[in-house]
Amino acid sequence: MNPQIRNPMERMYRDTFYDNFENEPILYGRSYTWLCYEVKIKRGRSNLLWDTGVFRGQVYFKPQYHAEMCFLSWFCGNQLPAYKCFQITWFVSWTPCPDCVAKLAEFLSEHPNVTLTISAARLYYYWERDYRRALCRLSQAGARVTIMDYEEFAYCWENFVYNEGQQFMPWYKFDENYAFLHRTLKEILRYLMDPDTFTFNFNNDPLVLRRRQTYLCYEVERLDNGTWVLMDQHMGFLCNEAKNLLCGFYGRHAELRFLDLVPSLQLDPAQIYRVTWFISWSPCFSWGCAGEVRAFLQENTHVRLRIFAARIYDYDPLYKEALQMLRDAGAQVSIMTYDEFEYCWDTFVYRQGCPFQPWDGLEEHSQALSGRLRAILQNQGN
């Protein structure tokens, strides 16, 4: 193997950067993928820069020659301690191919002490189903995937290019290309959930086992002249964030992750919004989810909340109290019926045209759970 491919470079030349990082959505004649990286070590609330560099990968060769795999080989070869938490940022000329995504998902699963952010100049074969699904899988594995904006191009120019003191100059249609790629990526990642993930975790049989993860599909609507208007850019999918005790992180439930997301939605206090959650488990009490949601609704009176739950936590009086707390805060809490399951399948699942197939007992379980929830909210539950 060419050692230049396996070992990182410090920087690239100006022409190389302009030629390979141009954000034209469809670009031919580029036989290399370029990857600029930063690795930081998390220390409390700050991050210490550990290393930076550039990898060049060959596009049309076997996956082990791709830039992403060169980085993983180099990173793992350093035998870094598992008790330290690392924050990796990539600036890449193309998003990873499906083979590289599979390896990246495996790497992230085996290294809970690592977070990965990938900012790409272009989307690789974004019109092909397998490549779109690979991006969904990458995001579902925990990687943050974005499109490079002007600030990130300028940052790469300053830190990874022999720029000879010159400033970064964007090319023709730079903003137009970015807008298209950003919109396309958001559309791809909207359909984040794998079909098997949905059917496994949203099964509403109260006796199902091994469903400890909470999945939350959300959408936001704005009230316009008495009509709720869906905001397509504010739809998505979240799940619990895994704990990492080595880094002192105890995890975060999907409901709290949504509340963390709200500031980025930039909801105008002068407007009225309705947030809808389709959630595999009703919000819990022990992690403070119900209390945090109540506080959010009290502080944001311009936001309405509807919660459709596949199953409810009601085995403990405190969990029943959590449901009552949400009701008292103004949230509308209901059990998912066939209509909600089908809507989630059509809206939030990468279903490839397949219609929703209900599982045995769906309607019976929904009716029974609705009765239990109604008793709790009417203070009739034990």
Curated annotation (Swiss-Prot):
InterPro entries: APOBEC/CMP_deaminase_Zn-bd, APOBEC_Cyt_Deaminase, CMP_dCMP_dom, Cytidine_deaminase-like
Name of the protein this chain belongs to: DNA dC->dU-editing enzyme APOBEC-3B
Keyword Flavoprotein attributed: no
Matching PANTHER family: DNA DC-DU-EDITING ENZYME APOBEC-3A-RELATED, MRNA EDITING ENZYME
Cofactor: Zn(2+)
Root EC class: hydrolase
Function: DNA deaminase (cytidine deaminase) which acts as an inhibitor of retrovirus replication and retrotransposon mobility via deaminase-dependent and -independent mechanisms. After the penetration of retroviral nucleocapsids into target cells of infection and the initiation of reverse transcription, it can induce the conversion of cytosine to uracil in the minus-sense single-strand viral DNA, leading to G-to-A hypermutations in the subsequent plus-strand viral DNA.
Cell compartments where the protein resides: Nucleus
Tissue expr: Expressed at high and moderate levels in peripheral blood leukocytes, spleen, testes, heart, thymus, prostate and ovary. Also expressed at low levels in several other tissues.
Misc. remarks from the entry: It is one of seven related genes or pseudogenes found in a cluster, thought to result from gene duplication, on chromosome 22.
Organism of derivation: Homo sapiens (Human)
